[in-house]
A protein has these predicted regions:
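N-terminal structured subdomain of primase-like DNA metabolism proteins
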Residues: 1-36
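Conserved glycine-rich cofactor-binding loop
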Residues: 46-47
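Substrate-binding pocket helix/loop in short-chain dehydrogenase/reductase
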Residues: 127-143, 236
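Active-site helix of classical SDR
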Residues: 157, 193, 201
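Alpha-helical segment proximal to the catalytic Tyr-Lys
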Residues: 162, 206-207, 264
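Short, small/polar-rich loop/turn modules that mediate ligand/substrate recognition or access, typified
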Residues: 168, 209, 214, 266-268
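Short C-terminal tail/terminal secondary-structure segment
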Residues: 181, 256, 267-279
């Protein structure tokens, strides 16, 4: 079978089949134009990596259901799902999570969920902006951080497993380079929660594989977001082998790959995205 006669799902095509490009991005976009739109649930979508991820998936034709503690901002978030597919939720509130899952399920209305991206995370600082270490972090802060960074991904995955099964979907957990080393700025609770999320990713990959659901993680290093000051960037860049910080768009592209058919045999992985900082 020649390449021109293949549809991009790997089966022999015909003249009536849509002309789907080889790369996963254009393939999804073409399928969406022909009525086969994929759906993504994305937490922490209002800024940084989450915002870049929502934008990329939207450009590829996906329907985006977003979750964040902020109301939907149509000026900053240029995806057509908009307010109708946004769930405003405070993930540190244990009573709010089941309500958020129920609202997402209602909006899915029994349709398949192709990807769940657990991106939301918090990293509290001391009142003076300094790092909270294992001696100075209050118990309430430990509980809040673990609720958002670890428990929320567990509950979203458990609550949406039936919809993920329908699509043989993909889950991507956003961990961090700080889960494997002490960081000068990230607090102890944040770092520990990200290490736990990496471990959880392996556990989930094992448990969800029976349903055809893949579970992976990405571990960003220093990424240029609103919270990274020029002074901090100047401090960090020289110690990174590529001598620069990354961009949210670069992280979003790896997330997209992990949610695509191109990564159909990848599960249980944690992909470092840090310019070689881990080596």
């Amino acid at each position: 079978v020649t390449l021109d006669l293949l549809d991009r799902d790997g089966a022999p095509g015909d003249a009536s089949a849509p002309d789907v490009a080889l790369c996963p991005f254009h393939g999804d976009k073409s399928r969406a134009q022909h009525g086969a739109r994929k759906t993504l649930v994305l937490t922490g979508a209002s800024r940084g990596i989450g915002h870049a991820t929502g934008k990329l998936f939207s450009e590829a034709g996906w329907r985006i259901i977003t979750c964040s503690r902020q109301p939907f901002d149509g000026d900053r978030c240029p995806w057509d799902s908009g307010t109708d597919s946004h769930v405003q939720v405070e993930l540190s509130d244990r009573r709010a999570l089941p309500r958020a899952v129920a609202e997402i399920k209602e909006r899915l209305d029994g349709q398949p969920l192709h990807a769940l991206i657990n991106n939301a995370g918090i990293s509290p600082k001391a009142a003076d902006g300094s790092r909270l270490n294992s001696l100075t972090t209050p118990v309430e802060t430990w509980m809040s951080v673990f609720h958002v960074n670890l428990l929320a991904p567990i509950l979203f995955a458990q609550g949406l497993v039936e919809e993920l099964k329908l699509a043989s979907g993909s889950i991507v957990n956003v961990t961090s380079i700080v889960g494997s080393r002490v960081h000068p700025f990230a607090g102890s609770a944040y770092a520990t929660s990200k290490a736990a999320l990496a471990c959880l990713t392996r556990e989930m990959a094992h448990d969800y594989a029976q349903f055809g659901i893949r579970v992976n993680a990405i571990a960003p290093g220093e990424i240029k977001t609103d919270i990274l000051s020029p002074e901090t960037e100047a401090q960090l860049a020289p110690i990174i082998p590529l001598h620069r910080v990354g961009t949210p768009d670069e992280v979003a592209k790896v997330i997209f790959f992990l949610c695509s058919d191109a990564a159909s045999y990848v599960t249980g992985a944690e992909v470092p995205i840090n310019g070689g900082q881990h080596v």
